[in-house]
Structure formats: structure tokens, C-alpha cells
Swiss-Prot record:
Family listed: Belongs to the peptidase T1B family. HslV subfamily.
Activity regulation behaviour: Allosterically activated by HslU binding.
Protein name: ATP-dependent protease subunit HslV
Annotated catalytic residues: 14
Gene coding for it: hslV
Primary location recorded for the protein, binned into one broad class: cytoplasm
Any one annotated GO CC term: proteasome core complex
Sorted UniProt keywords: Allosteric enzyme, Cytoplasm, Hydrolase, Metal-binding, Protease, Sodium, Threonine protease
Subunit structure: A double ring-shaped homohexamer of HslV is capped on each side by a ring-shaped HslU homohexamer. The assembly of the HslU/HslV complex is dependent on binding of ATP.
């Protein structure tokens, strides 16, 4: 994700993929963090559990910004327990209107057993038409691969692993060090 200050190197850093299939929802993310043309870290953890394990989420963008947003989402999930959509809408409203938050540069994919959502600082709270959604510099590669695989025999986790492997082979800002979280879906 590009920084707003043109004097700083561009930050590119990830592929996050969500697949919902066969009673499971899986979010996977790679571990590469790049600053400009340099790989800074290869094993970052960009996918995690929230709300005592009831929600999984992954982020693309500036790491500190994403952690801030995860903390805010965690607070909203405590305020609206079991209501991921409501918590996300409330977070996004704050993200758009708060002077500090609106500067944050990140996107998030979050899911619980019922719904998966994409959140952005532009005010987006989007649910995918299909069971697949991706963000980040390699997101379109992973999304294309997952859509091609979703009608086959592979389960959700296998689709995530295969699609992320394909994205890592194409996108220079994505690597094969995966963190994957899974939930049983409704």
C-alpha cells in the first residue's frame, strides 16, 4: 500500500485471501513485509483471531495502522458481541470520521461463522458475492486462483494454500510463508 508522503518509499506488503466453502471459512496471509525494493521481514503475522477466537481477520497495509484497527475492531466486537457486521460498520464510521483514524492506511478481511467482510478506510464494508475475497498487492492473483479452484474438489484451506502459492509465484511483494486461521462456518 502506498504511503501518502511521496518522500517515503512505497510500502507494499501482502496478500490476504478468504475462502468460505464446505462449512468452513479460512483466511490466509503471507509473511513478507517490503519497504521500497527491500524485503524487511519474511515471517510477519498478518492474520489473527479476534473476539476470543470467534472472528478471524487479516490485514494489508501499514502494520501499525492495521494493529490500531484490529484493536478498535476488538473494542467494537465487545460492544456488539456476536454482531460482526454491526461492529464493522461502526468501526468504518469511526475510521471515516475520526481525524486520527482516517489517516490510517490499511484494508482488512474479517470473518465469523456467518459472514466475511472487507473493510477499508474509504468507508467500504463489503461482503463478497461468492465465498472468496482477497486484498493486498497479490490479492488479484490469489482471488483469480481461488475462484478457479472453488468449484473443484479442494476444501477451503487447500484452496487458500494453493492460491497463495500461485500469488507468491507471481507477486514480488508476496512470499510463501503462510499464516492460516480457520473457523467452522454456519
Amino acid at each position: 500500500m502506498a504511503q501518502t508522503d511521496d518522500r517515503l518509499p512505497q510500502m507494499h506488503a501482502t496478500t490476504i485471501l478468504m475462502v468460505r466453502k464446505g462449512g468452513r471459512v479460512v483466511i490466509g496471509g503471507d509473511g513478507q513485509v517490503s519497504l521500497g525494493q527491500t524485503i524487511v521481514k519474511g515471517n510477519a503475522r498478518k492474520v489473527r483471531r479476534l473476539a476470543k477466537g470467534a472472528v478471524i481477520g487479516g490485514f494489508a497495509g501499514a502494520t501499525a495502522d492495521a494493529f490500531t484497527l484490529f484493536e478498535r475492531l476488538e473494542a467494537k466486537l465487545e460492544q456488539y458481541p456476536g454482531q460482526l457486521s454491526r461492529a464493522c460498520v461502526e468501526l468504518t464510521k469511526d475510521w471515516r470520521t475520526d481525524r486520527y483514524l482516517r489517516r490510517l492506511e490499511a484494508m482488512m478481511l474479517v470473518a465469523d461463522k456467518e459472514v466475511g467482510l472487507l473493510l477499508s478506510g474509504a468507508g467500504d464494508v463489503l461482503e463478497p458475492e461468492t465465498g472468496v475475497m482477497a486484498i493486498g498487492s497479490g490479492g488479484n492473483y490469489a482471488l483469480s486462483a481461488a475462484r478457479a479452484l472453488e468449484d473443484g474438489e479442494l476444501d477451503a484451506e487447500a484452496i487458500v494454500r494453493r492460491s497463495m502459492k500461485i500469488a507468491a509465484e507471481i507477486c514480488v511483494y508476496t512470499n510463501g510463508n503462510l499464516v492460516i486461521e480457520t473457523l467452522d462456518a454456519a
